[in-house]
Amino acid sequence: MHFSTVTRDMEAFAASSLSGLGSPSPGADPFGPREPPPPRYDPCAAVPGAPGPPPPRAYPFAPAPGAAGSSAAESEGPGASRAAAVKAPVKKNPKVASVSVQLEMKALWDEFNQLGTEMIVTKAGRRMFPTFQVKLFGMDPMADYMLLMDFVPVDDKRYRYAFHSSSWLVAGKADPATPGRVHYHPDSPAKGAQWMKQIVSFDKLKLTNNLLDDNGQIILNSMHRYQPRFHVVYVDPRKDSEKYAEENFKTFVFEETRFTAVTAYQNHRITQLKIASNPFAKGFRDCDPEDWPRNHRPGALPLVSAFARSRNPVASPTQPNGSDKDAAEARREFDRDSGPAALGDATHPPQLLARVLSPALPGPGGLVPLPGGSGGRHSPPHADLRLEAPGASEPLHHHPYKYPAAAYDHYLGAKSRPAPYPLPGLRGHGYHPHAHPHAHPHHHHHPAVNPAAAAAAAAAANVYSSAAAPPGAYDYCPR
């Protein structure tokens, strides 16, 4: 596929995305914008011969009864038009209609969801844990697809945590929303064969509460609940593909991934579970690796985090390891993560882009496909990537997801209990940063985006987000 005038295409996409944010989704989106309530009319004395007030559903553009050319949908007003759209959803392109998605680490997401998942937001931006990872099926191996995520409010409420009852309570109406953002997977667009080849990880995605963020991070309001949405967009090669924008994407919602955005963890059980299940919470875990059961030792299960960062998006996982310089930088980033959240991230080189497709813990996943629904500059390399020095362990010739157990042993210390989830082994690979132009600070721009995919992505975009809250105390998420 040949792409030209990348900057102009990206500017066009940014404009179309912003213009499409307020448009209704073509399907039944429970988290989309709601139609304002119909007007209320004060009762008044009827005047003989005078027409009465129009019915509420007919406001404000209902034709008179029996008017020529009026249809059932028109006679019921805009609300019924939307209801008709729900009854007759847009027929999806066969390239996306057969796509299905499985959520990885579903058991871990379920455990967090039962407690009430919390995700840290900071001014500098913070990565999610658990990381959103999926396995894709049913794509056309030779067709091009883009993968993106956005976040929509679960409701219009603001919450507070009641420590005496260990529960979340409604604190009032939600804060004003700002135009939403979408996050593109850094390998977009790519062939369906590549996407289906291995597990896709959105470990570059960062959450922030900085309303003035210019790094393309997802802006959220602290103490509000959000639902992540995952979108598959077919890159339509037709010249008039804008006409089919609503047909060329498919949206998936996993309800177990919803969370409350916070500046510091409120529920101590969430804190404990994140420490126990996050292999990089080394400064806070109180168990000795020698006390671990054999099946809970690092390396006993496949990788959770990212690997195979290279210029070639379909590079083999048997590529050489990263350099000593990469390893030192990754270690320094992790050491910063072990400190207080208020310290924030160190300054990173601008326009840093790393390609990532990663394997993860296998597990069954449910999905809720929606018929409708929908970035910015990429953040620095994932803190979860811990690179080894070359030759630190045997090559990965036997299995692409097999990683040495020794990689995590030095991250653990003290004594007590084993973690409830196995900590995976990890072998890193060198990544190659790419300079990347920016066309709009509110959207992620990838050099391989054409107008066809832009139109489909714009149709898929329908989000709200923003936040501003003071930095919190300690937290243990990877950045």
Swiss-Prot record:
Position of sequence motif Nuclear localization signal: 415-426
Compartments (UniProt record): Nucleus
Basic and acidic residues bias: start-end ranges: 323-338
Main localization, broad class: nucleus
Residue ranges, compositional bias (Low complexity): 15-31, 59-86
Effect of inactivating the gene: Mice die at birth with hypoplastic and intermittent missing craniofacial muscles, cleft palate, absent thymus and parathyroid glands, as well as a persistent truncus arteriosus (PTA) with a ventricular septal defect (VSD). The first arch forms in but the distal pharyngeal arch fails to become segmented, thereby explaining, why the pharyngeal arch derived structures are malformed. Conditional deletion in the skin epithelium leads to delayed tissue regeneration due to progressive depletion of stem cells.
Variant or mutagenesis effect after changing F137Y: Does not affect transcription factor activity or nuclear localization
Polar residues compositional bias, start-end: 313-322
Region (Disordered) residue spans: 15-86, 311-398
DNA-binding region: 108-286
InterPro entries: p53-like_TF_DNA-bd_sf, T-box_DNA-bd, T-box_sf, TF_T-box, TF_T-box_CS
Tissue: Expressed in skeletal muscle, lung and testis. Highly expressed in hair follicle stem cell, but not in terminally differentiating cells.
CDD domains: T-box_TBX1_10-like (cd20187)
GO biological process: ameloblast differentiation; angiogenesis; anterior/posterior pattern specification; aorta morphogenesis; artery morphogenesis; blood vessel development; blood vessel morphogenesis; blood vessel remodeling
Keyword terms of this UniProt record: Developmental protein, DNA-binding, Nucleus, Transcription, Transcription regulation
Entry's Gene Ontology molecular function annotations: DNA-binding transcription activator activity, RNA polymerase II-specific; protein homodimerization activity; RNA polymerase II cis-regulatory region sequence-specific DNA binding; RNA polymerase II intronic transcription regulatory region sequence-specific DNA binding; sequence-specific DNA binding
Any one GO cellular component localisation term in the record: nucleus
Main function: Transcription factor that plays a key role in cardiovascular development by promoting pharyngeal arch segmentation during embryonic development. Also involved in craniofacial muscle development. Together with NKX2-5, acts as a regulator of asymmetric cardiac morphogenesis by promoting expression of PITX2. Acts upstream of TBX1 for the formation of the thymus and parathyroid glands from the third pharyngeal pouch. Required for hair follicle stem cell self-renewal. Binds to the palindromic T site 5'-TTCACACCTAGGTGTGAA-3' DNA sequence.
Subunit structure: Binds DNA as a dimer. Interacts with DSCR6. Interacts with NKX2-5.
Protein known as: T-box transcription factor TBX1
Gene behind this protein: Tbx1
